[in-house]
Amino acid sequence: MTVATGEPADEAAALPGHPQDTYDPEADHECCERVVTNISGLRFETQLKTLAQFPETLLGDPKKRMRFFDPLRNEIFFVRNRPSFDAILYYYQSGGRLRRPVNVPLDIFSEEIRFYELGEEAMEMFREDEGYIKEEERPLPENEFQRQVWLLFEYPESSGPARIIAIVSVMVILISIVSFCLETLPIFRDENEDMHGGGVTFHTYSNSTIGYQQSTSFTDPFFIVETLCIIWFSFEFLVRFFACPSKAGFFTNIMNIIDIVAIIPYFITLGTELAEKPEDAQQGQQAMSLAILRVIRLVRVFRIFKLSRHSKGLQILGQTLKASMRELGLLIFFLFIGVILFSSAVYFAEADERESQFPSIPDAFWWAVVSMTTVGYGDMVPTTIGGKIVGSLCAIAGVLTIALPVPVIVSNFNYFYHRETEGEEQAQYLQVTSCPKIPSSPDLKKSRSASTISKSDYMEIQEGVNNSNEDFREENLKTANCTLANTNYVNITKMLTDV
């Protein structure tokens, strides 16, 4: 049972221990004040406190959104994409959750995020939600001279001299590869035999004739070509190393590792030839040295990967394979299981056949691999009915196994391909000529050739353009002496004059 006292409400509120609730009508009015936003004729209504959660954005900053205010209709007017604003408004209402509508393309929604100035964090959140792979930062050296040298050797499209250096590097790589292939022709290759003459014993290794008292390999044309190529590769590698922004990160780059692998075999081979002594030239040691030299010289073929530094296509392929390692691992795992199953099955299916081509399960591995990959050399074939059934199932299983991860790999390739082409389109020369009062920005002087620019750099350039336009618009509100060709801007001064 509740008992009501006879004390007035005001007196009870004034007693000690009773909190006094103060009511501020103006604060409550500001809290509940609503604002209307018109997006190309579609009107949205929300509270100001909702927009004020993100004061750095276009709608959250009163000064920024006032540029688009229409005093006649008492609303904010934008000529923007209407379906995108549902997600933009929900970003304010939910406190920072951003999700692209399914009927809005990626590029359009990205432009809307930049226009409403939701910030870098919102853009990164959106990109992660869409499955974009975060781009690695590519810092530049702080020293001006090192920066110029680094751009000259690392970014072929940064300037004309950089292109010339890239062309020279590609030509040297091609000459080295052609020389590596031509020296194996029979007309250039010497047989491994001992030649005795003039008291000097010679031993030939691969294409080089090595003399213990007087070497003739240094006059070999292929050796001279190889030496010239190595001189260029070494010079290029050392210049890159001394100009790089991070010495520790330099050796973690796969391209620099390829450069090292392309150079080291020459010096190992040269050192082995020079260190050879006549008393060590026994047959066993000669065969061992020959095998080692052949393996080392085989590593030279990896020099072809140096072309990927100057080829966007090879870079895209490498990035695709790197991003698809999980799918490729699953593919190899599935193939491994299939090889074990079908090689075992075909062995037991052909076990009773006297002329069976599958003497053991390991011998059947090769047949299972070429069958599952739909190559089918025909060097090993089943002859019994059971073996042919197993072979048919093996081929069908191979097709299905290989086809499953292919769409994911193709999707990754399309992503990296479009990212590279988009980066080239975004790195165009930006120049604003609509009004002489627009301040020039040094960030706008980016040539189209700078296709290596990252998306973060492009967003900074875009932000610089927006800031320049904002400064001009604020001046335009005061002077009204210049017209800016922008459909998203409402000239309040002109509107009031017309009224």
Curated annotation (Swiss-Prot):
Post-translational modification: Phosphorylated on tyrosine residues; phosphorylation increases in response to ischemia. Phosphorylated on tyrosine residues by activated PTK2B/PYK2. Phosphorylation on tyrosine residues suppresses ion channel activity. Phosphorylated on tyrosine residues in response to CHRM1 activation; this abolishes interaction with CTTN. This is probably due to endocytosis of the phosphorylated channel subunits. Phosphorylated on serine residues in response to increased cAMP levels; phosphorylation is apparently not catalyzed by PKA. N-glycosylated, with complex, sialylated N-glycans.
Lipid positions (S-palmitoyl cysteine): C244
GO molecular function, one term: delayed rectifier potassium channel activity
Phosphotyrosine PTM sites in chain numbering: Y429, Y458
Activity control: Inhibited by 4-aminopyridine (4-AP). Inhibited by dendrotoxin (DTX) and charybdotoxin (CTX), but not by tetraethylammonium (TEA). Inhibited by tityustoxin-K alpha (TsTX-Kalpha), a toxin that is highly specific for KCNA2. Inhibited by maurotoxin. Inhibited by kappaM conotoxins kappaM-RIIIJ and kappaM-RIIIK.
Intracellular or extracellular location(s): Cell membrane; Membrane; Cell projection, Axon; Synapse
GO biological process terms held by the UniProt record: action potential; neuronal action potential; potassium ion transmembrane transport; protein homooligomerization; regulation of dopamine secretion; sensory perception of pain
Source organism superkingdom: Eukaryota
Tissue-wise expression: Expressed in a wide variety of gastrointestinal smooth muscles. Not expressed in portal vein, renal artery, and uterus.
Keyword rRNA-binding among UniProt keywords: no
Cytoplasmic compartment spans: 1-160, 244-254, 311-325, 418-499
Reaction(s) catalysed by this chain's protein: K(+)(in) = K(+)(out)
Site (Important for binding with the scorpion mesomartoxin): V381
Region: Tetramerization domain, residue numbers: 1-125
Residues that span the membrane, as ranges: 161-182, 222-243, 255-275, 290-310, 326-347, 389-417
Pfam family, one: Ion_trans
Assembly information from the UniProt record: Homotetramer and heterotetramer with other channel-forming alpha subunits, such as KCNA1, KCNA4, KCNA5, KCNA6 and KCNA7. Channel activity is regulated by interaction with the beta subunits, including KCNAB1 and KCNAB2. Identified in a complex with KCNA1 and KCNAB2. Identified in a complex with KCNA5 and KCNAB1. Interacts with the beta subunit KCNAB1. Identified in a complex with KCNA4 and FYN. Interacts with PTK2B. Interacts (via C-terminus) with CTTN.
Domain remarks: The cytoplasmic N-terminus is important for tetramerization. Interactions between the different subunits modulate the gating characteristics. Besides, the cytoplasmic N-terminal domain mediates interaction with RHOA and thus is required for RHOA-mediated endocytosis.
Protein name: Potassium voltage-gated channel subfamily A member 2
